[in-house]
Amino acid sequence: MAEVVPAAKRERHHAGEFLHGYRVRKWLGDGAFSVVYLVEDPKTHVQYALKHVISEGEKEDRYLDQLRMEWEAGRKLKHPNIRDIVDLRGDQTFGFIKKPGKDLGLVMEMIDAPSLEDLLLKNEPRFSIAQWISIFRDVASAFVHIHEKGFAHADMKPNNILWDRDHTKVIDFGQAWKIGTKKPRMSGTAGYVAPEQPLIDVITAQTDVFNFGATMYRLLRGKFAPQAVQKGYPRDFQLAEDVIGESTPLTQWNPEIPERLSDLVLNCLELEPSRRKYMTFVLKQLESMQPVSVK
């Protein structure tokens, strides 16, 4: 079986070349097994981001499957706080027969904005609590829409939230999965993973609620939530408070944080999924904390 070659080690496409019908403008970045380019439609001159994935062996086919799931979820999602997914190139259809491709390109809305992870690492800008609530409200609104369409994101973290002064956008549905079905592989990112995720259990909306709670905790506190699964936990570990820590209320760290917000974050971080509120409740709580939009 062929060795898996990370995307960063593969030859990149250069400006002016064509890729899946789009003209490459420049390289934007590498994922674990994808390369993202700024591309332009030669007919309309509209610019997009194109995520390019190639499989050179059976081991890498799962990355193609992830891209197809990202397309399946993304094309059904139309929300102002979710990045638009425009097209998937590379698979071929002949009548009722579909021939899977080994070279796929996911065409996405181009967003020129940093992630909250970027801003967190740079320690800029310093958001007010009102601004954080506004951002959290936008993200929760996006998640309500995602869940209504029957999907879970399964990898919420600051790096998957883009922000500028006018927009908040949830991105990267590469780990998305249909709610109520079992995911064959663990998803998520250490420091944000819900306790049930390493068990490769059925994906539910409450998994996203936990991931979002861990994200809010990190952004408000600057540290990872103790309840979130960290790197190195075995997949067969049991849910127990002596294994996974507890978070102290955020109000003890910053008295400017409203008690209702602190309580909401801690509820999202409940170890048992059944004890977490639904995202509709989370959104209503955030909306009630801030009736006026603050950017």
Regions found by a protein language model. Name each.
Residues K78-F94:
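Conserved HxN/HPN-centered segment at the entrance to the catalytic loop
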Residues E58-K76:
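AlphaC helix of the eukaryotic protein kinase fold
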Residues D208:
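Conserved catalytic-loop aspartate of Hanks-type protein kinases
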Residues H147-W163:
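Catalytic-loop of the protein kinase fold
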Residues I135-F136:
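Activation segment signature within eukaryotic-like protein kinase domains
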Residues I97-S115:
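Conserved short submotifs of the Hanks-type protein kinase catalytic core
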Residues R25-G31, V36:
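Protein kinase glycine-rich loop
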